[in-house]
């Protein structure tokens, strides 16, 4: 995806009041997935979506009515607690579910009554590693980051001359 869609509209509001606060990290335009469980519960890890100061429990949300026909198969791996399986479905699946979640959490959504009981306060959860990370290569491309790190090793010359012309990648595991 090279452009943003209407789920990123700055004017979009949520029925989750805390998601509309100017200083929130998780407005309706930013719906990150994560792995959580209720603090001290010892229950199984679940996949959720942060919204305002809440987490939408996708295991509970998947069982609620009102989803379009193409959404339950996308929620199934998340309801089972498997973010890797969901990511393996590809970009179209992610965009489709993002749109469905945005509509469901938007102000005036007919799903509000069904989904409100699926919210858990972020302050009442503990977070876990969201997925199984097998391998990765990191590309060192942020000039501000590269400058800050370079100052640690070479305070007088933080960026080497080739930085802007030669991609720098390294194995991260």
Where are these regions (language model features)?
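Active-site microenvironments in enzyme catalytic cores
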Residues: 6-38, 50, 57-173
């Amino acid at each position: 995806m090279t452009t943003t869609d209407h789920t990123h509209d700055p004017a979009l509001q949520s029925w989750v009041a805390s998601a509309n606060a100017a200083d929130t990290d998780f407005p309706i335009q930013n719906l990150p997935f994560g792995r959580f469980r209720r603090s001290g519960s010892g229950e199984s890890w679940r996949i959720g979506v942060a919204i305002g100061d809440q987490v939408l429990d996708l295991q509970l949300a998947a069982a609620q009515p009102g989803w379009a026909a193409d959404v339950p198969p996308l929620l199934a791996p998340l309801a089972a607690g498997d973010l890797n399986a969901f990511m393996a479905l590809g970009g179209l699946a992610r965009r489709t579910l993002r749109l469905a979640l945005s509509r469901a959490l938007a102000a005036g959504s007919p799903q509000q009554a069904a989904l409100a009981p699926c919210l858990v306060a972020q302050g009442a959860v503990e977070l876990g590693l969201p997925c199984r990370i097998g391998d990765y290569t990191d590309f060192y491309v942020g000039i501000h980051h590269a400058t800050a790190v370079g100052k640690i090793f070479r305070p007088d010359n933080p960026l080497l001359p080739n930085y802007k012309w030669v991609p720098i990648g390294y194995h991260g595991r």
